[in-house]
UniProtKB/Swiss-Prot annotation:
The keyword Transcription regulation applies. Residues 65-123 bind DNA. InterPro entries: AP2/ERF_dom, AP2/ERF_dom_sf, DNA-bd_dom_sf, ERF_plant. It holds the Pfam family AP2. This is Ethylene-response factor C3. Keywords: Activator, DNA-binding, Ethylene signaling pathway, Nucleus, Plant defense, Transcription, Transcription regulation. Induction: Induced by wounding and infection with the fungal pathogen Botrytis cinerea. SMART domains: AP2 (SM00380). The lineage of its organism: Eukaryota, Viridiplantae, Streptophyta, Embryophyta, Tracheophyta.
Length: 193
């Protein structure tokens, strides 16, 4: 039963299981009446999507999804690709601070593997330029994906070595030669026990 207005509902109230003297029933009745009047307004309007709904949906979506990129629970982004030269094995390319870096790593691997047939996140010119900056030369013996993975892991290792070297350096205050002699003598006497 489709009623176009609240008056129509009042006219047919006997057909609905509402008690006019009960406040809860009347509250429910008013909600049904408002809903039916809104349905008629919506059905008479066009079937297009409201612009408000579209913009609010896009505002909720914060991160852009990139091909070959997954967000880790701790906030980093992992890039990986299926390597067709190795029977479709999934190859982890690296973990990156932001999604764009991870997407570029995926694009580099995809372009190196598939060439112009690759489906990329970024324009081909950007990917080619980034590969040229890395001075990538792929030989026929090795998978280009593995080669890129090695480059990313070497870069990561060199950064971690630099950080480790900075952490391993301990600077002592010069307390004089006499104090150093006392420390050496006391350490020798402890080891002789």
């Amino acid at each position: 039963m489709d009623y176009s207005s609240r008056d129509d509902l009042l006219f047919h109230y006997n057909s609905l299981p509402f008690n006019v003297n009960d406040t809860q029933d009347m509250l429910l009745y008013n909600l049904v009446a408002e809903g039916s009047s809104q349905e008629t307004v919506n059905s008479s309007s066009s079937y297009g999507i409201k612009e408000e709904e579209v913009t609010s949906y896009e505002e909720e979506r914060k991160d852009k999804n990139y091909r070959g990129v997954r967000k880790r629970p701790w906030g980093k982004y992992a890039a990986e690709i299926r390597d067709s030269t190795r029977n479709g094995v999934r190859v982890w390319l690296g973990t990156f601070d932001n999604a764009e870096e991870a997407a570029l790593a995926y694009d580099q691997a995809a372009f190196a593997m598939r060439g112009s047939m690759a489906i990329l996140n970024f324009p081909v010119e950007i990917v080619k330029e980034s590969l040229n900056e890395m001075k990538c030369r792929f030989d026929g013996n090795c998978s280009p994906v593995i080669e890129l993975k090695k480059r990313y892991s070497m870069r990561r290792k060199s950064v971690s070595r630099k950080n480790r070297a900075r952490k391993d350096v301990v600077v002592f205050e010069d307390l004089g030669a006499e104090y150093l002699e006392e420390l050496l003598i006391s350490s020798e006497s402890i080891t002789n026990w």
